[in-house]
């Protein structure tokens, strides 16, 4: 009997005790039908209706009607025939924002669109001890079962850097058809739904730094990797050009790329997009840059000798629900945020300690918060300013479309979906909280009444801040918070810094 049958048999024994084998098979058939219903083929987050009243909610994503599904599949089949595709990757993000996928032969694609692709849950959710589940103790028997990857057809793209292969980003569900409550993408989509229900939409883009190294060479018995690119940005243009062109064909529009602070370090900026697309673009980059680098015998890494790059900056602005007006841009002609923008920023400042736990979730990447400080403290102030790139929250006032806030809490280890979700949750709390009500749109920069929380330098303290932040606990879900905190505590208890560095190098390179 397979794992799914074992799970169903165990549940049926608990509920009824004397269920016959025939009834068990009927239950199995009903469960399979439940998983394969077409509601998971979602396209627009704005048309979802997700309640956050409890963690057992179901995803009510947009249902594709048979004509819509037929039209989508027709275009996909044409693309598969035109490019003579042989394989399709079903990709989902794990906790770190790294792609975990299953690849299927292309001729099975239509079947898998309806039924999904099963994957062991442990591939996405690494648990310290499967028998002592801290993350989802209500349904511990379900934790070690498979999950189902259901494709979002709007993300189907041919991968230019993989031979005759396409990919589709998936949402994750349990075998009983419920959304996986620890899925970062699901959490981000849920927060965007809440934002739209409040009458707003989010325009955002990620800015990433990464390093490109050549093949390691042995000099004087030491293995050394030299930078593959220079400050002049012309040492190996074909690599960056192929990467940017490939990202464009996967739906991720790059606004610019340039050399960064040291040889071999590059910065890449995406064009702002509404909704979940900005996180999808960042997710695509994190996989694509490594695959293109391998073709050139390079190594792409988000780790440099001084620690993780200041990577994963989220530049964002708030717009009305019709996406026509920037709610951050002041009409007074001065470089000031609107009252709405100030309330949003007040929410980010208020929750900055807890946000830092999600956006710098390792010991190594938190060192950059204190890299310029000689005094040893437990925390550092949360800084913000107008057109000041040294601040954690940098308010850029570049005209109506260019007025935005850069959230620089993110590091290379941050999951872009969690960065997006947590930013929206904190900003929404600022909009809705009476504590941050402004006295008036004056020119004073001291616009919030509640002092911003300081950023802990130790991950242990950041975990405490996250556990005590009731707003983020409710927004992201108790199940996810328990899972995230348990995982990080396990890492802190069982790994030294040197071992952690090696783990991250192996994982992220």
From Swiss-Prot:
Expression by tissue: Abundantly expressed in lens.
A Pfam family this protein belongs to? Answer: Gln-synt_C
Any Gene Ontology CC annotation: membrane
Name all GS catalytic domain ranges.
Answer: 184-509
> Gene3D superfamilies of this UniProt entry?
Glutamine synthetase, N-terminal domain (3.10.20.70), Glutamine synthetase/guanido kinase, catalytic domain (3.30.590.10)
Please give the Gene Ontology molecular function terms for this protein. Answer: catalytic activity
Q: Check the record and name the SMART domains matching this protein.
A: Gln-synt_C (SM01230)
Q: Which PROSITE patterns match?
A: GS_BETA_GRASP, GS_CATALYTIC
Q: Annotated region Disordered: where? A: 1-34
Q: Which domain of life is it from?
A: Eukaryota
InterPro entries for this protein = Gln_synt_N, Gln_synt_N_sf, Gln_synth/guanido_kin_cat_dom, Gln_synth_cat_dom
Domain named GS beta-grasp is located at 83-177
**What's this chain's function?**
May act as a component of the cytoskeleton or as a chaperone for the reorganization of intermediate filament proteins during terminal differentiation in the lens. Does not seem to have enzymatic activity.
Subunit comment for this entry?
A: Dodecamer. Interacts with BFSP2 and VIM.
- Say which family it is in: Belongs to the glutamine synthetase family.
Q: What is this protein called?
A: Lengsin
Protein encoded by which gene? LGSN
């Amino acid at each position: 009997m397979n794992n799914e049958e074992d799970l169903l048999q165990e549940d049926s024994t608990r509920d009824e005790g004397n269920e016959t084998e025939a009834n068990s098979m009927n239950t199995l058939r009903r469960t399979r039908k439940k998983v394969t219903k077409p509601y998971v083929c979602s396209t627009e987050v704005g048309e979802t209706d997700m309640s956050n009243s409890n963690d057992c909610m179901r995803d009510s994503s947009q249902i594709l009607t048979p004509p819509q599904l037929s039209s989508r599949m027709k275009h996909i089949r044409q693309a598969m025939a035109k490019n003579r595709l042989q394989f399709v990757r079903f990709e989902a993000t794990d906790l770190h924002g790294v792609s975990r996928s299953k690849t299927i032969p292309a001729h099975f694609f239509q079947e898998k669109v309806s039924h999904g692709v099963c994957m062991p849950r442990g591939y996405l959710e690494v648990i310290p001890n499967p028998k002592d589940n801290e993350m989802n103790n209500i349904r511990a028997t379900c934790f070690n079962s498979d999950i189902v990857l259901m494709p979002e057809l709007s993300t189907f793209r041919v991968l230019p850097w993989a031979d005759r292969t396409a990919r589709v980003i998936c949402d994750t569900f349990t075998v009983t058809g419920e959304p996986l409550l620890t899925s970062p993408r699901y959490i981000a989509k849920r927060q965007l739904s809440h934002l739209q229900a409040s009458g707003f939409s989010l325009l955002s883009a990620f800015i990433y730094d990464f390093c490109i190294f050549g093949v390691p060479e042995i000099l004087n018995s030491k293995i050394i990797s030299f930078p593959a690119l220079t400050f002049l940005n012309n040492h190996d243009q074909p690599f960056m050009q192929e990467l940017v062109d490939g990202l464009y064909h996967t739906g991720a529009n790059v606004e610019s790329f340039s050399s960064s602070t040291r040889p071999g370090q590059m910065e890449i900026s995406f064009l702002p997009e509404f909704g979940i697309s900005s996180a999808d673009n960042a997710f695509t980059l994190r996989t694509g840059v490594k695959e293109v680098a391998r073709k050139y015998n390079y190594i792409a890494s988000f780790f440099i000798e001084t620690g993780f790059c200041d990577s994963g900056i989220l530049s964002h602005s708030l717009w009305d629900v019709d996406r026509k007006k920037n709610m951050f841009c002041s009409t007074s002609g001065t470089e000031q945020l609107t009252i709405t923008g100030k309330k949003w920023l007040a929410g980010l400042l208020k929750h900055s300690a807890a946000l830092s736990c999600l956006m710098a979730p390792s010991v190594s990447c938190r060192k950059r918060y204190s890299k310029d400080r000689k005094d040893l403290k437990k925390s550092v102030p949360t800084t913000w300013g107008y057109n000041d790139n040294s601040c954690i929250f940098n308010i850029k006032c570049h005209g109506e479309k260019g007025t935005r806030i850069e959230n620089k809490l993110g590091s290379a280890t941050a999951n872009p979906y969690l960065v997006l979700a947590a930013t929206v949750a904190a900003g929404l709390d600022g909009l809705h909280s009476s504590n941050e009500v402004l006295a008036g749109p004056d020119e004073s920069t001291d616009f919030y009444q509640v002092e911003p929380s300081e950023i802990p330098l130790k991950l242990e303290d950041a975990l405490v801040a996250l556990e005590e932040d009731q707003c983020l606990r409710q927004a992201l879900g108790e199940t996810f918070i328990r899972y995230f905190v348990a995982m990080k505590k396990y890492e802190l208890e069982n790994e030294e810094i040197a071992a952690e560095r090696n783990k991250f190098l192996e994982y992220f390179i």
